[in-house]
Amino acid sequence: MGIRYLLVLVLVLLVLGCEVQGAHMPQQDEATTSSLFTQMQESFYGYWGIAKSAAQGLYEKTYLTTMDEKIREIYNKSTAAVSTYAGIFTDQLLSMLKGDQ
């Protein structure tokens, strides 16, 4: 289960990293005939678009709302516990610093 999320994370980061670099704008060649390089380049960008849409579909398919709710619940419980223990620690520290008066 962890490997699947790691794979999704890597794919999403790869897509985001490539999107940050900017969209590819094909340049107008002076020659009317396309060379082998431009054909390979167009083919690569076509495959890249398919892979990008597949990664996005995989991410949307694996996004679980129940997992999101569980994470929010755990966060709320942990912050409540931390604030409670921080209050207890502060009270103990103040009573130690004040001493018996």
From Swiss-Prot:
State the source organism's domain of life. Eukaryota
Q: Signal peptide position in this chain? A: 1-22
What is one Gene Ontology biological process annotated in the Swiss-Prot or TrEMBL record?
A: lipid catabolic process
Query: Where are the residues of the annotated region Lipid binding?
Result: 66-74
User: Quick one: where's region Lipoprotein lipase cofactor?
Assistant: 78-101
Tell me the compartments it is located in.
Answer: Secreted
Q: Which of UniProt's keywords are assigned here?
A: Chylomicron, Glycoprotein, HDL, LDL, Lipid degradation, Lipid metabolism, Lipid transport, Lipoprotein, Secreted, Sialic acid, Signal, Transport, VLDL
Q: Say if the entry is tagged with keyword Signal.
A: yes
> Can you quote a single GO CC term?
chylomicron
The post-translation modification note in this UniProt entry reads:
Proapolipoprotein C-II is synthesized as a sialic acid containing glycoprotein which is subsequently desialylated prior to its proteolytic processing. Proapolipoprotein C-II, the major form found in plasma undergoes proteolytic cleavage of its N-terminal hexapeptide to generate apolipoprotein C-II, which occurs as the minor form in plasma.
Q: Which GO terms describe its molecular function?
A: phospholipase activator activity; phospholipase binding
Role according to the record? Component of chylomicrons, very low-density lipoproteins (VLDL), low-density lipoproteins (LDL), and high-density lipoproteins (HDL) in plasma. Plays an important role in lipoprotein metabolism as an activator of lipoprotein lipase. Both proapolipoprotein C-II and apolipoprotein C-II can activate lipoprotein lipase.
The entry assigns this protein to a family as follows:
Belongs to the apolipoprotein C2 family.
- In its UniProt entry, what is this protein called? Apolipoprotein C-II
Source organism of the structure: Leptonychotes weddellii
